Amino acid sequence: MSTEFVFVDHQAAQASVRQKPKLSRRRGACENCKRRKVRCSGANPCEQCLKVNVHCWYIGNNQSRRRSVPNSGADKNNQQGDTDRHNGARLGLESFGHLHFFSESFLDAQSIPMDQPPGSSPVMDFDPYDYDASPLSMSNEQTALIDWDQLEATSNYVALGISANSGNNFIADQCFSETRTATNRASKDPLNGGCHNTLHTGEFTHDSRTVDELLNDSIPLAFAASTKSSLSFDYVRSSLHSWLLTAMTELDGDENRHILQTFERLLNANSPVIRHPSLNEDVNSIEILNSLRSESSQNRALVYRCIDACFSNPNRVGIFLDRMTVEELVCQVLAHPFVSSPISIALCLSFLAVGSRDLSLDDDCREMNAMNLFRTALYIRPNPSSGPSLWTFQALLLMAHFSCDIGAESTTSLMTDTATCVQALRLHSSAAISNLCSSDSERVNLKRAFWTFFAVEKLHCIQEGLFPLIHGEYADHKVAAPQDPLCRRYDCLYSDVGYAKICSKILQQLQGQQDISQVGSSCCGRESYKQSPAFTANRLETMLMEWKGNLPFDGDGKNIFTATSPGERRIRLTCINMYHFAMIAIHSLPGVEDTDASKRQRCESAREILDMSEHITSADLLYDWSVPPLCPDC
């Protein structure tokens, strides 16, 4: 049986071939995965790119965008997944809508930067839900919800675009012009190591270091306010902190904790207030800083009154600090507290605590309570082991001085931290001080700060029975003369250092480290011998009488109230109390405390102190720090 053969026409074969889809690579295929049989939709990445989690290069290289709808099931699924993630992010952000973190005038307070062309949109005008249009790169990592490195790089540029007349800016008009001038000056200053934060018109340079690393660097004694002002004047982030944390204080504990955890993820360790785990202390710090920077109250006038009270007596804070730099520091911290370093905040609050105690503002103003201010400063005090600097030394010295005067339990730990800074900075060496400072005035202030701590530490040690950590015998410089003409007539630091050296000798006898009355030597086989304890006490008493004779007034307490001014009367009162206090300590040494002469001398000194206490007023106790710890009635 024969089989019939059928021949296929050439045109029919071509028609059957055209029925199959062509899967070869066309224009617009993905350039990353190089897949020839994969079609990208143009709106979503291809399936292969999603599998390997890489960026699809289709959008940037597509030359033919004729189709705008998905052409496969995989593309539809991918688009649906992106839509779900988009809606989920929108829902997560809208869950905080009822809290009203920001004021209605947030966008109104923004203005266009100086380099932005007319007619363009403001800096902060973008859709937070539009990932492609957002200027901030979004991420799902634990602490990278916002790319703050990108924001920090543009912080100084954006800062120039924010209005200086915002309601939350404390003395903004004054500081705004000073910031740009100081920043340009700092960028050309060779003493600052070529300040990494250079700011020019139309361009900026990004510093690879963090804000904390910049703020913790070693800086001159005058705080280097001009060189660091650009870091403290981040208007956008300061307003963000202020409005959000102000709203937190109006919520209950659970909502506060939830918001604080969320905000800590957004601003990872850039704010000293949210860096610590204790929520109660965080809220307390927030309330204090917000109330101090409020323009609706009289707190600004109280702040300047506190500064005046601190420097009213040049022999107190003015011994080792400069008023002009202190005012600049306080103004910067109160203008933008939430972007300031913990060191600057602690130093500012310590100043306000001192002034509030002098003015007795505890009952008149709750925000200016001295103990609350000092407790907050103590909570965020700097750690010298993380990198000591002159700024850290100044903050710890002021806090230790204040803590010693009020008799706080934190005095010993503050003294130890301050001594650590002194050792790390080698402040006993004149050469080291010259390397740390850039001017003669800073060197003088730093030397006086060293001897101030030397005097305060010895007074605290003799009261608590501790051994000192800093010894003046190893310092190669002496007490520098004060620069203030008001202090040159009578410098209390000279008498304080002389009294501290006597206290150091007394402590040596109490601790049994060395006997200052030891005579002879162990050379040539001869053993050294010691004088009696009575001779040691007489030697110390002679040194104390010499110190009393060098005072610029009659050491006899009979004419102490004939001083021409209240300040001079208080100085005389303090020195007489210090003299009798040391006399009691000398006659309480082992070996002489049980003798009749020592008992008689202790009774006489105690009687003199009691007689002086009758004339001490409350103003004296608030004005002079040295009177309360020496007065037995206090």
UniProtKB/Swiss-Prot annotation:
Which SUPFAM superfamilies does UniProt cross-reference here?
Zn2/Cys6 DNA-binding domain (SSF57701)
GO process terms (BP) = DNA-templated transcription
Residues annotated as DNA-binding are 30-56
Main location (coarse class): nucleus
Q: Where is this region: Disordered?
A: 66-89
Q: What does this protein do?
A: Transcription factor that regulates the expression of the gene cluster that mediates the biosynthesis of AAL-toxins, sphinganine-analog mycotoxins responsible for Alternaria stem canker on tomato by the tomato pathotype.
Further information in the entry reads: Gene clusters encoding host-selective toxins (HSTs) are localized on conditionally dispensable chromosomes (CDCs), also called supernumerary chromosomes, where they are present in multiple copies. The CDCs are not essential for saprophytic growth but controls host-selective pathogenicity.
Q: What's the protein name?
A: AAl-toxin cluster-specific transcription factor ALT13
Organism encoding this protein: Alternaria alternata (Alternaria rot fungus)
